[in-house]
């Protein structure tokens, strides 16, 4: 059965999917949510955080539909997705099991994930906007927390570690 896995940025979703293409796909949300017109020369990571990105009409609907269709094929063991609360809520309302992997909130996590983001090419503005979410214990509404599987992990973990340790 295909597992839907949302994970905090920089946990190795793309890397794991590239290393395990027969079992895993990473559905990068920015490819569904924003037009790349004028930004084709940028990597996906560089593209994140650009304020001038043009939203794609119904991008979230298309992204959700792609997630559901990909799971329905049964081709993959893991479908990696973004961790937007509204997306997770929609999947939970549709009765889908969703695993959300988040590092324990700490200054160590903040340092590690900031360093990972910069190393992979994320813009500083993106890092400044995302990293503080490590410390938000209320990032997801209580009613959503009861419908998803939240997996907290040490700062040093990547998704490979989570899967190898059978935490999802």
Locate the predicted segments by residue.
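Glycine-rich phosphate-binding P-loop
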Residues: 2-21
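Short, polar loop motifs at secondary-structure junctions
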Residues: 9-12, 82-87
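Short, aromatic/basic amphipathic alpha-helical patches
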Residues: 16-17, 89-95, 116, 137-144, ...
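Conserved substrate/cofactor phosphate-moiety recognition/catalytic segment
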Residues: 18-70, 113
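Conserved beta-strand scaffold positions in the cores of enzyme catalytic domains, especially
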Residues: 22-26, 97-100, 148-152
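Loop/turn-to-beta-strand initiation segments
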Residues: 74-80
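Conserved phosphate-donor/acceptor-positioning beta-strand/loop module used by diverse small-molecule
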Residues: 80-83, 94-116
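Small-molecule kinase domains that catalyze NTP-dependent phosphoryl transfer to phosphate-bearing small molecules
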Residues: 121-168
């Amino acid at each position: 059965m295909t597992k839907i896995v949302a994970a905090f940025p920089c946990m190795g979703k793309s890397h794991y999917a590239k290393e395990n293409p027969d079992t895993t796909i990473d559905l990068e949300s920015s490819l569904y949510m924003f037009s790349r017109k004028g930004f084709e020369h940028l990597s996906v990571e560089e593209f994140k955080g650009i304020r001038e990105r043009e939203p794609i009409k119904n991008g979230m609907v298309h992204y959700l539909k792609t997630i559901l269709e990909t799971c329905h094929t049964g081709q993959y063991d893991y479908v990696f997705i973004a961790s937007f609360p509204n997306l997770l809520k929609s999947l939970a309302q549709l009765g889908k099991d969703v695993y959300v992997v988040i590092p324990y909130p700490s200054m160590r996590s903040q340092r590690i994930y900031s360093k990972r983001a910069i190393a992979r090419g994320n813009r500083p503005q993106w890092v400044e906007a995302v990293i503080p979410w490590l410390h938000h214990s209320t990032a997801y509404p209580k009613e959503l927390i009861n419908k998803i599987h939240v997996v907290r992990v040490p700062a040093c973990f990547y998704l490979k570690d989570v899967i190898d340790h059978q935490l999802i």
